[in-house]
Amino acid sequence: MSTLFISDIHLCSDRPDMTAALVRFLERDAPGADALYVLGDLFEFWIGDDDPNPLHHAIADAFAALRQRGVSIYFIHGNRDFLLGRQFAKRSGMTLLADPCVIDLYGERVLLSHGDLLCTLDLGYQKLRRITQLKWLRWLFLRLPLTRRLAIACKMRGQSQMENVQKSQTIMDVTPAAVDALLRQHGCQLLIHGHTHRPAIHDFTLDGQPARRIVLGDWFEQGSVLVCSPGEQRLEQRTLPSLNPAGAHESDNL
C-alpha cells in the first residue's frame, strides 16, 4: 500500500533520457501504487493540448496505460505547464486538481501544491503568476497559431532563465510565513510541494504541534519520488537510463 508523488520532470524533446526514465517509472514502479500525484511542471512548457508534439502523445499513452492497470492519477498544474487542459488529462487518465488542494492520505489531511505560490519574496514572479492566471488571457493565447504560441513560450522561457541567474536562492525559495499561513488556512500539518528543486523533508512546529513540509526534487540528473505509506514518507532517487541502463535506484530515508 503506497501513494507516489513526483514533480518537476520538465520533459522536452532535448532530454530523451528524462522521458525514458519517466516511462520506465510508470511501467515498472508505479503500477504497484494506490495512486500517483504529479505536482506540476511535468513538461518544460505547454502551449496547448492541440500541440501535435510526438512526445506529448507518448507520455499520454504511458499514463493511460498506468491508469488502465488500476492506479489513480492526479495532476496539479505547474508554472511551466499551467495550460495543460482537460483534453490531455482525459487522454492520459488524469484527474486535474486545484492548487492548492487537500487530500486524505491514509487518514491524514495533507496539503498539496506545486509550490510557486509560496515563493512570496519573488515579487516579479508573483506578478507574472497573477497575470498568467487570468482566464481571458489564457483563452486568447490558446487561439493564437501554434507557431506563434511556441515563439512566445520560448521567449518567456529564455527570459526566465536569465532572470533566475540574477536572483538569490532565498528569493526563489518558499517563505516560512507563507507555508505556515497556507497550512493554517487548510487545517493541515503536512505539506507536499515541488517547484524549488530542493528535495528534503523539513520538520517544524506549527501552533505547538509537529508539522512537516516535504519538497520534491526535479528529474534533471536523477529522478525524485516521494513514496508514502501509512505512517511513513520516504524520498527516493531514481537513476536516469543514460547513467544506469540497468535501472537501479537509490533510496534516502529522511
Swiss-Prot record:
Uppermost EC category: hydrolase
Note on cofactor: Binds 2 Mn(2+) ions per subunit in a binuclear metal center.
Membrane topology: Peripheral membrane protein
Keywords: Cell inner membrane, Cell membrane, Hydrolase, Lipid A biosynthesis, Lipid biosynthesis, Lipid metabolism, Manganese, Membrane, Metal-binding
GO MF terms held by the record: manganese ion binding; UDP-2,3-diacylglucosamine hydrolase activity
KW Signal (keyword) present: no
EC number: 3.6.1.54
Major location (coarse): membrane
Subcellular location: Cell inner membrane
Cofactor(s) listed in the protein's UniProt record: Mn(2+)
Entry binding sites for Mn(2+) 2: 41, 79, 114, 195
Binding positions (substrate): 79-80, 122, 160, 164, 167, 195
Pathway(s) per entry: Glycolipid biosynthesis; lipid IV(A) biosynthesis; lipid IV(A) from (3R)-3-hydroxytetradecanoyl-[acyl-carrier-protein] and UDP-N-acetyl-alpha-D-glucosamine: step 4/6
SUPFAM superfamilies registered for this protein in UniProt: Metallo-dependent phosphatases (SSF56300)
Gene3D superfamilies: 3.60.21.10
Reactions mediated catalytically: UDP-2-N,3-O-bis[(3R)-3-hydroxytetradecanoyl]-alpha-D-glucosamine + H2O = 2-N,3-O-bis[(3R)-3-hydroxytetradecanoyl]-alpha-D-glucosaminyl 1-phosphate + UMP + 2 H(+)
Family under the similarity heading: Belongs to the LpxH family.
Function: Hydrolyzes the pyrophosphate bond of UDP-2,3-diacylglucosamine to yield 2,3-diacylglucosamine 1-phosphate (lipid X) and UMP by catalyzing the attack of water at the alpha-P atom. Involved in the biosynthesis of lipid A, a phosphorylated glycolipid that anchors the lipopolysaccharide to the outer membrane of the cell.
Name of this protein: UDP-2,3-diacylglucosamine hydrolase
Organism this protein belongs to: Aeromonas salmonicida (strain A449)
Gene name per UniProt: lpxH
